[in-house]
Each structure stands twice: as C-alpha cells, then as structure tokens.
Amino acid sequence: MAKLQITLTRSVIGRPETQRKTVEALGLKKTNSSVVVEDNPAIRGQINKVRHLLTVEEK
C-alpha cells in the first residue's frame, strides 16, 4: 500500500471540536508537525474532513 505524509499547516485554534479531534486522531499535535500513515479509506475520510488545515504528499 502507498504511504501518505500528512503535515498540519494551519492551526486548530478557533476550529470546531470535531475538527480538533480529527487532527488529533491523525496523530498531529502542533502546526508543521508531520506523520507518515498507510493510505486507506478511513485515513482518506479523516483527511477530507480537515483538508483545509493539512498538506498531503504521497510517499
């Protein structure tokens, strides 16, 4: 399976609680933090929910 590098590029300050929890579930804590995850439908759904806060690259 492909891997995705996800970077939190915008702050979660002032965002709804659901978006904050989604960012936390992806393993991101601070702005400019990154994680590498497996590409699967569950992760894609989370990314789509907060795509305005993230940068996603395929690895």
Swiss-Prot record:
Superkingdom per UniProt: Bacteria
Protein's UniProt keywords contain Ribosomal protein: yes
Residues passing through the membrane, by range: none
Signal peptide: none
Gene Ontology process terms (BP): translation
Molecular-function annotations in GO: structural constituent of ribosome
InterPro entries: Ribo_uL30_ferredoxin-like_sf, Ribosomal_uL30_bac-type, Ribosomal_uL30_ferredoxin-like
Keyword Ribosomal protein (UniProt): yes
HAMAP family per the UniProt record, alphabetical: Ribosomal_uL30_B
Subunit structure: Part of the 50S ribosomal subunit.
Protein name: Large ribosomal subunit protein uL30
Organism: Staphylococcus haemolyticus (strain JCSC1435)
